[in-house]
Regions:
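Short helix/loop segment immediately N-terminal to the Walker
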Residues: 58-65, 180, 287-296
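N-terminal pre-Walker A segment at the start of P-loop NTPase domains
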Residues: 1-20
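Conserved inter-motif catalytic segment of the P-loop NTP-binding fold
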Residues: 15-16, 20-22, 26, 37-39, ...
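Gly/Ala-rich phosphate-binding loop of Rossmann-like dinucleotide-binding domains
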Residues: 53
Length: 306
């Protein structure tokens, strides 16, 4: 058995947070970017990769540690048809942005948590400062459900080790759940444990008063003060990648974009109860994996909930 080694708190040297995007994306940390399809989550992530690769300021004018390398794992967009053209349009240094080799076994990317070491080696070999996983559901081992708190944390735990070891910012993309109701902290797909495992969460949503404008807003940020929301829109296109235009700050907050204020519908008591029971059910299944199957009475209660 390996002994647990302990260190006195007095022996630890205080360390300030290092930022890829000051106040928003921390180096050595995991962050979430959440939103419905069609609002440009992938485009935003590629924009940040492009800015890092070329050393250009971030959308709010703040600096980044570039020029530096980035790795993009995309499970939904074709690298040749979509990823490269977008990066090029965004002004990326294409020699500094890496994707899995199409001729490799990991044509889309490694699965988590079983193949995290291959990913760790890739980050080390390329000295990457940003790792984008888009979306997280495409890169999970078979049988891993993000609706399970324990499973979600287990899948993301190796990414914490990777981020800390290489001082790399890990950006995990996910879709919103289908409820369409409730505060933003509960709108991200999967268990609340996914949010708990990451140090920051950012959400994109449409401006309710200007449908052609979308907004990036903070859901949570454990490592820095609250940051202002940023508005953006896409212009052009017509067969070519559209232009991403950042429009400055917005007064809209996350709950106004995806919660009751934005949707105009308040979560009903019955819906809230069903959501809570589903979370309890997922937690019960986690305990079953550790402590063994439930007895008959417990199983009947769970069946009644369903």
């Amino acid at each position: 058995m390996i002994a647990l080694r302990l260190t006195r708190a007095s022996e630890l040297k205080p360390q300030a947070v290092s930022w890829l995007w000051p106040g928003r994306l921390a180096l050595g940390s995991r962050s979430l970017l959440s939103g419905d399809p069609g609002l440009g989550k992938t485009f935003l992530a590629l924009d940040w990769c492009a800015r890092l690769s070329s050393g250009r300021p971030m959308p709010d004018g703040s600096p980044n540690p570039g020029p530096a390398n980035a790795i993009v794992l995309s499970g939904e967009d074709d690298p040749k048809q979509t990823i490269r053209p977008r990066l090029e349009a965004l002004g990326a240094d294409l020699d500094r942005v890496f994707i899995p080799n199409p001729s490799d076994d990991f044509v889309d990317g490694p699965c988590l948590p079983s193949q995290w070491k291959q990913l760790d080696e890739a980050v080390a070999a390329r000295d990457a400062r940003l790792l984008v996983i888009d979306p997280i559901t495409e890169f999970l081992d078979a049988g891993i459900s993000l609706n399970s708190d324990v499973a979600a944390r287990r899948a993301l735990r190796p990414l914490k080790r990777l981020a800390t070891r290489h001082q790399c910012a890990v950006l995990v993309l996910r879709h919103l759940n289908k409820s369409g109701r409730g505060p933003s902290i509960y709108r991200g797909g999967g268990s609340i444990g996914l949010l708990g495992a990451c140090r920051s969460d950012w959400v994109v949503g449409r401006d309710p008063t200007q449908p052609d404008i979308s907004v990036l807003a903070q859901v949570k940020n454990n490592l820095g003060p609250r940051q202002p929301s940023l508005a953006y829109r896409f212009e052009g296109g017509d067969g070519a990648p559209p232009n991403l235009v950042w429009l400055g700050t917005s007064s809209l907050q996350a709950d106004q974009l995806v919660g009751p204020a934005g949707g105009g519908v308040k979560e009903k008591a019955g819906e809230r109860a069903r959501r809570v029971l589903k979370e309890i059910h997922a937690l019960h299944l986690d305990f079953e994996r550790v402590l063994g199957p439930a007895n008959g009475d417990d199983r009947q209660v769970l069946d009644d909930w369903e």
